[in-house]
């Protein structure tokens, strides 16, 4: 893990070429009429419930609170440090999107989720997410009951799926991972200096995975990570929780 330095965020407006319409689909609110976004230099109207200004870190789309229950579908996110940030929200589905060419010193992940639940990340493509700090494909922080299924991950410097700070009951199922990861395909880490806790009951099954980002084999899972240094009292160490926080449910095969 690495430390991030804050910098002044760039303020943007999402310009919509036509009005939005809302349609019910399977009990969820799906926003239609969305074209590819065009960003300007000032804040503007939100396209999704709970959408608002982004914190420092160069995100493209930020949701903080709101009713949830909607879908982000069929978009392409590229050319920034990060793509989507979800905070304090439930029951959001992210499906059929492409996350590519994300890079920068404040890059955390393609999809960064905090303090949320019931997030579904399904049938997306994550490719060329790379920086010196090992950014991830999906990064769940204090997040529960979420599903990562049927996605493809390739050329990602950090672990393609990383969970943190008490994340529990999350599943990683039926994904394909190639040339991605520094420590594992699915890893858990916490900042014990901030009082963050171990997760629990996270699972992985029926995935296909190849070597890590540098072309060498990686373990499928690593859990109970803490620390970030190479030596000394802050040395990165695994299996520091009392019980495993991620369980291999089987059916995972190497490519």
Model regions: which residues?
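Structural detector of coil-to-beta-strand junctions
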Residues: 60-62, 83-84, 110, 135-137, ...
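Short, recurring structural edge motifs at helix starts
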Residues: 60, 81, 190-195
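Secretory targeting and sorting signals
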Residues: 2-41
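Right-handed parallel beta-helix
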Residues: 49, 68-79, 90-103, 117-130, ...
């Amino acid at each position: 893990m690495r430390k991030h330095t804050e910098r002044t965020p760039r303020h943007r407006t999402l310009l919509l070429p036509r009005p939005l319409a809302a349609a019910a689909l399977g009990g969820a609110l799906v926003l239609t009429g969305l074209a590819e976004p065009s960003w300007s230099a000032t804040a503007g109207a939100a396209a999704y419930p709970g959408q608002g200004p982004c914190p420092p870190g160069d995100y493209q789309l930020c949701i903080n609170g709101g009713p949830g229950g909607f879908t982000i579908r069929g978009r392409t996110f590229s050319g920034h440090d990060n793509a989507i940030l979800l905070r304090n929200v439930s029951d959001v589905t992210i499906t059929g999107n492409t996350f590519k060419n994300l890079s920068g010193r404040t890059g955390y992940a393609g999809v960064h989720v905090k303090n949320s639940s019931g997030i579904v990340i399904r049938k997306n493509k994550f490719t060329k997410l790379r920086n010196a700090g090992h950014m991830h494909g999906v990064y769940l922080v204090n997040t529960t009951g979420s599903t990562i299924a049927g996605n493809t991950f390739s050329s990602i410097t950090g672990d393609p799926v990383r969970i943190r700070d008490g994340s529990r009951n999350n599943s990683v199922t039926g994904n394909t991972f190639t040339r991605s990861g520094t420590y594992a395909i699915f890893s858990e880490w916490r900042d014990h200096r901030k009082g963050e806790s171990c997760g629990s009951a996270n699972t992985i099954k029926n995935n296909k995975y190849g070597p890590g980002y540098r072309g060498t084999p990686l373990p499928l899972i690593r859990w109970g990570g803490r620390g970030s240094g190479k030596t000394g009292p802050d040395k990165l160490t695994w299996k520091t929780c009392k019980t495993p926080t991620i369980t291999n449910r089987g059916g995972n095969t190497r490519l």
